[in-house]
């Protein structure tokens, strides 16, 4: 998939003035780090955007704690760029970004999700759920920085599930990518009712490497950049 993307004329074409310096915070998926979005970062930078990593490690921590960290990164990137920023998240990173956008719409210009099961994060592949639950057992043994049982059955789970079920504020437009070929996050669970939903033909992990993703994303991001205000909106 990577060679195909690198050969694609739409991906290789550089338009350094298109983004106008609009910031984009990149949030990786469960079990992946910031380097998993390095090609997206390069594509954004070549078009005049200012991408920044979320710096949440491998995205295996407590949901509420990770949203707190994403919020702080949003604040930093808004301060750095002087205006609201776009959140672009893959899989779990997408719905974590949605939680942060719902909490702080004053910081978010738009939201892009790739294979993010916002309608039911626990409705993903049983294999992934088993891996996540294994982390809670390690957490119970004292290993820090991991999901815990509260993220599955306690206040953390219930609070964040309710937030995901709520509509996004009108000031935060959203674009949700999903694939019927996705064997990790079912296509139906990625249909965010607050977003413009777009279908592409891709596996779950290769979605951010698909030329169609960039072809569809480009005009949307450019429109957000062109119409953006230069300062964060009031809460």
Question: Where are the regions that the model predicts?
Answer:
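Flexible, membrane-associating and regulatory peripheral segments of lipid-active enzymes
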Residues: 1-25, 32-42, 47, 230-235
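Glycine-rich phosphate/ribose-binding loops and adjacent secondary-structure elements
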Residues: 59
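Helical cap/lid subdomain of alpha/beta-hydrolase-fold lipid enzymes
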Residues: 102-103, 109-235
């Amino acid at each position: 998939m990577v060679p195909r993307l690198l050969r694609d004329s739409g991906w290789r074409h550089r338009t350094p003035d298109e983004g106008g310096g609009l910031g984009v915070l990149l949030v990786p998926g469960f079990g992946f780090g910031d380097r998993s979005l390095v090609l997206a970062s390069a594509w954004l930078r070549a078009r005049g955007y200012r991408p920044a990593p979320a710096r949440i490690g491998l995205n295996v921590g407590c949901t509420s704690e990770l949203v707190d960290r994403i919020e702080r990164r949003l604040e930093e990137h808004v301060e750095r760029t002087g205006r609201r920023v776009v959140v672009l998240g893959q899989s779990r990173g997408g719905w974590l970004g949605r939680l942060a956008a719902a909490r702080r719409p004053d910081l978010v210009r738009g939201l892009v999700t790739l294979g993010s099961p916002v309608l039911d994060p626990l409705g993903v592949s049983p294999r992934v759920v088993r891996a996540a639950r294994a982390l809670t057992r390690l957490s119970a043994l004292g290993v820090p920085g991991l999901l815990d049982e509260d993220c599955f059955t306690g206040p953390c789970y219930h609070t964040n599930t309710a937030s995901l079920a709520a509509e996004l504020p009108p000031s935060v437009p959203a674009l949700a990518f999903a694939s019927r070929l996705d064997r990790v996050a079912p296509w139906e669970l990625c249909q965010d009712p607050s977003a413009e939903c777009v279908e592409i033909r891709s596996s779950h992990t290769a979605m951010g490497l698909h030329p169609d993703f960039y072809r569809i994303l480009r005009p949307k991001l450019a429109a957000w950049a062109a119409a953006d205000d230069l300062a964060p909106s009031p809460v």
